UniProtKB/Swiss-Prot annotation:
PANTHER family assigned: EXODEOXYRIBONUCLEASE 7 SMALL SUBUNIT
Record's protein name: Exodeoxyribonuclease 7 small subunit
Molecular function as annotated in GO: exodeoxyribonuclease VII activity
Pfam family, one: Exonuc_VII_S
EC main group: hydrolase
Recorded family membership: Belongs to the XseB family.
Protein function: Bidirectionally degrades single-stranded DNA into large acid-insoluble oligonucleotides, which are then degraded further into small acid-soluble oligonucleotides.
UniProt EC number: 3.1.11.6
């Protein structure tokens, strides 16, 4: 049995900025319309994966900021 190709496998390697830029492009294509149902579903799935990647980056940034604040200690 052949392994299925994941068209969204490249997303894990994207920076936040790259993922966000691609997400904006996907949303634009979906809003423009004109794509077939199959293409629209593929775009939607990619958009969901890109949004998850952005959330992962943002959550990582929140954790790093919290850790930095904890290391700095109370300022007051």
């Amino acid at each position: 049995m052949a392994a299925e190709h994941n068209p969204n496998a490249d997303i894990e390697a994207l920076s936040y900025e790259e993922a966000r830029e691609q997400l904006v492009a996907v949303v634009g294509k979906l809003e423009a319309g004109g794509a077939s149902l199959e293409d629209s579903l593929a775009l939607w799935e990619r958009g969901e994966a890109l949004a998850r990647r952005c959330e992962e980056w943002l959550e990582g940034a929140r954790k790093r900021l919290a850790a930095a604040r904890n290391q700095a200690g109370p300022e007051s």
